[in-house]
């Protein structure tokens, strides 16, 4: 009945959905991608999502000694994220249409080669444009299972199209396609677009540590990287890792900084060639959640940038 309602509405409003589209669609169990980072195993969803950007950046950062409040550490993280996003936007698409396998991008040898590009100055490279988002993330656990879950209809109310009588707002993930000729993510029939939603999961010494995630469109992989660095490099607890001030790479090679990042760090980054500015809107820097299993206890943390909370019952 729901499928019929969708089809009738699509036909009445000039939509392109067909019965064959709905019949061909099915959820998929996928094998997550992972990398080892300084004692943690970091798990992310594979393409057609942007989880690979998190792992690419961490592979680059593995070769650096990162320290809290060290301006150089900010520079290195920003450059690693820019390189990771450049690869992600160029190669990630529906996995049936990708030119490179994720394993090739995530090889440690490739990371070592790319790491040499990170020097004493900001790289003169422009990233593709970002787009707005509308995403919800939650992490949950009990005595037996742990879940990292994310859902998004993309821009606010998605397409803005509500199917009468259903309460369902249709998403507009088709906006994630490219129109560039020859790009693996170019729009086409039966293809799935590049998308932003990436629930994460961490393990230590082969044992599950717990789910984590950061809502926020193209801030998601950047938030994941900064949370993992806080945990693995700086030894922070989950709440402190979420609380820590963040940066974000945005279009035009600009870097946004939260007000909590010291002025001296901003000046240092400017001297290295970064275009930085402070942004007071905390919602732009993602909203995260974490649940970890520590021994017999579960530890929850919630980002102060949103109205979420850690709740036990």
Locate predicted features.
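Alpha-helical support elements that line or immediately flank enzyme active sites
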Residues: 1-11, 214-236
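Accessory "access/gating" subregions that flank catalytic or transport cores
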Residues: 1-47, 116-130, 138-139
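Short glycine-rich loop/turn motifs
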Residues: 30-32, 54, 133-138, 146, ...
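Internal maturation/activation junctions in enzymes
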Residues: 66-153, 165-166, 173, 280
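Extended C-terminal subregions enriched in glycine
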Residues: 74, 97, 191, 224, ...
């Amino acid at each position: 009945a729901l499928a019929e309602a969708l089809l009738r509405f699509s036909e009445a409003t000039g939509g392109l959905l067909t019965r064959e589209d709905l019949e061909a669609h099915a959820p998929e169990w996928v094998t997550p991608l992972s990398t080892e980072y300084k004692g943690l195993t970091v798990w992310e969803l594979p393409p057609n999502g942007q989880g690979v950007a998190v792992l690419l950046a961490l592979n680059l950062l593995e070769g650096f000694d990162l320290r809290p409040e060290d301006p150089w550490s900010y520079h290195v993280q920003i450059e690693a994220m820019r390189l990771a996003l450049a690869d992600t936007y160029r190669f990630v698409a529906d996995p049936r249409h990708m030119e490179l396998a994720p394993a090739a991008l995530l090889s440690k040898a490739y990371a070592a080669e790319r790491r040499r590009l990170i020097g004493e100055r900001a790289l003169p490279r422009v990233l593709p444009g970002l787009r707005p988002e509308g995403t919800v993330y939650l992490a949950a656990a009990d005595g037996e299972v742990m879940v990292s879950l994310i859902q998004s209809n993309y821009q606010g109310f998605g397409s803005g199209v509500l199917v009468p009588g259903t309460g369902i707002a249709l998403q507009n993930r088709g906006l994630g396609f490219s129109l560039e000729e020859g790009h693996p993510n170019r729009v086409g029939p039966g293809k799935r677009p590049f998308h932003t939603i990436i629930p994460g999961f961490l393990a230590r010494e082969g044992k599950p540590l717990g789910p984590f995630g950061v809502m926020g469109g193209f801030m998601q992989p950047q938030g994941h990287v900064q949370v993992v660095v806080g945990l693995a490099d700086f030894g922070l607890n989950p709440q402190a890792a979420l609380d820590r001030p963040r940066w974000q790479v945005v279009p035009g090679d600009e870097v946004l900084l939260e007000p909590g990042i010291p002025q001296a760090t901003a000046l240092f980054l400017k001297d290295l060639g970064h275009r930085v500015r402070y942004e007071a809107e905390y919602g732009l820097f993602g909203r995260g959640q974490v649940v970890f299993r520590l021994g017999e206890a579960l530890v929850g943390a919630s980002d102060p940038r949103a109205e979420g909370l850690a709740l036990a019952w």
